[in-house]
Amino acid sequence: MATRLANTPQRETGTVIERKEQQLKPPAMYKVVLLNDDYTPMEFVVMILQQYFSRDRETATQIMLTVHREGKGVCGIYTRDIAATKVELVSTHARQAGHPLQCVMEEA
């Protein structure tokens, strides 16, 4: 009879376990979009873009003009949670300032 030492690994026979590599998908991305209205001052929109989306003044002005001319403009593209947070922050700030500015998120 063979004696097995305590630290000797035991050998498995018959079954091979394969490891499958997990393929992680990148998270879904969402556009944060400002919608045009006839009441929110252009300067307020520029300030929102600078404060909440870290846009420089020139870029913020270009986005604001896109919102004004085309009815909506993309502020940035983010993961769902970040986009939802930005929409809520902008909407709350606009409401508190007495402006009807609307901010929404759309799938990118």
Curated annotation (Swiss-Prot):
InterPro entries: ClpS (IPR022935), ClpS_core (IPR003769), Ribosomal_bL12_C/ClpS-like (IPR014719). Involved in the modulation of the specificity of the ClpAP-mediated ATP-dependent protein degradation. Belongs to the ClpS family. It comes from Cupriavidus metallidurans (strain ATCC 43123 / DSM 2839 / NBRC 102507 / CH34) (Ralstonia metallidurans). Coiled coil: none annotated. GO terms for biological process: protein catabolic process; proteolysis. Binds to the N-terminal domain of the chaperone ClpA. This is ATP-dependent Clp protease adapter protein ClpS. Gene3D superfamilies: 3.30.1390.10.
